[in-house]
Design a protein with these regions (language model features):
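Glycine-rich, phosphate-binding/catalytic loops in enzymes
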Residues: 1-2, 81
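A contiguous loop/helix-start segment that scaffolds small-molecule binding in enzyme catalytic cores
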Residues: 60-61, 65-108
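Class I SAM-dependent methyltransferase SAM-binding "motif I" and its flanking Rossmann-like core
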Residues: 2-58
């Protein structure tokens, strides 16, 4: 059902709980029987590059955290350097709290 809502630009809200990862997966509309959680990216350096390349090469749903002041730079880097503009994206903010923000980007 979440996938149909996503495809039709209908936003659904999770019941806030203990896990931001599970809450985001419950509303994203992506196939989530297989997913990987990558945590936070390193701020800079080789470790960041390695993790970004891992996310890009992952074929299933990928979940990661990013700081609000770095999210635009990270998304830009993923789009420009790694050419992931063809992948759907959902950005969730404050997903386990009352004021939830969900942004959906569909590549098609």
């Amino acid at each position: 059902m979440a996938e149909a809502c996503f495809q039709n630009n209908i936003i659904i809200h999770p019941i806030p709980g203990a896990s931001a990862v599970v809450a985001a997966l419950s509303v994203c509309g992506f196939q989530s029987s297989q997913f990987s959680f990558f945590g936070f990216f390193d701020v800079k350096g080789k470790e960041r590059t390695i993790k970004l390349e891992e996310v890009v090469s992952y074929k299933h749903t990928a979940v990661f955290f990013e700081a609000p002041h770095r999210i635009l730079a990270t998304l830009s880097q993923l789009s420009v350097e790694y050419k992931v503009g063809s992948r759907d994206c959902v950005i969730c903010r404050e997903i386990t709290k009352v004021c939830i923000y969900i942004f959906m980007y569909m590549s098609h």
